[in-house]
Amino acid sequence: MRVSNWSAIGLLTIAIASASGQARDYKDTYTASDAGKPMAPAKALDVMLTQLETEVMGVAQAMPAEKYNFAPTAETFAPGSPAKFGTVRTFAGQLTHIAGANYHFYSLVSGATPPAASKGVRDLKTKDEILAALKESFAYSHAQIMTITPQNAFNGIEGLDGFHTPATLAAFAVAHGYDHYGQLVEYLRMNGVVPPGSN
């Protein structure tokens, strides 16, 4: 059975929305009057991005500032284990990775050059700096996703293997963010913090 591109995006939307395990009220996204009507690709994809932003910003705010340098170690899981944890990102590193990835992926979606502020985002250390940078990266991402139109949503992006259209790349960027969101939730729990999505 062949699945259309729009069906694939719809299925991905459902899968990603379900990944958080929480019912959310994302105001100003979909309304009852939208049911059964075509929706612009940018609007549909932006809903996914809004959901991710809500989840990521929630965990970023929930972690105490003094725990931003936390990273799991072998001792966290199995003392004496031969597993190597030397390259595991800290909580701060996970968040700056998401911010940097937002700039990278969404600049490819639109063809825009990322702003100068994106260059040093991975070097930020404090909670306040990281929260501000993360928020800016999501604002940039929302602006770039709005460049997706019915006409260009599935046009090939030259030189980009794997995720080669604006729509599929935008969807992948959200999926990538949820991968790291899941890790951030575990970091919170390892530090006795209940993730906002579980309240």
Task: Give the location of each predicted region.
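Positively charged n-region of N-terminal signal peptides that target proteins for export
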Residues: 1-5
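Bacterial N-terminal signal peptides
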Residues: 7-18
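Low-complexity, Gly/Pro
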Residues: 23-26, 65, 114, 143, ...
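Short, contiguous alpha-helical
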Residues: 23-30, 34, 42, 46, ...
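Electrostatic cytochrome c docking/interface patches
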Residues: 36-41, 126
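Acidic/histidine-rich alpha-helical segments that form the ligand environment
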Residues: 48, 122-157, 166-180
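Amphipathic alpha-helices that form helix-helix packing interfaces
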Residues: 52, 59, 101, 134-137, ...
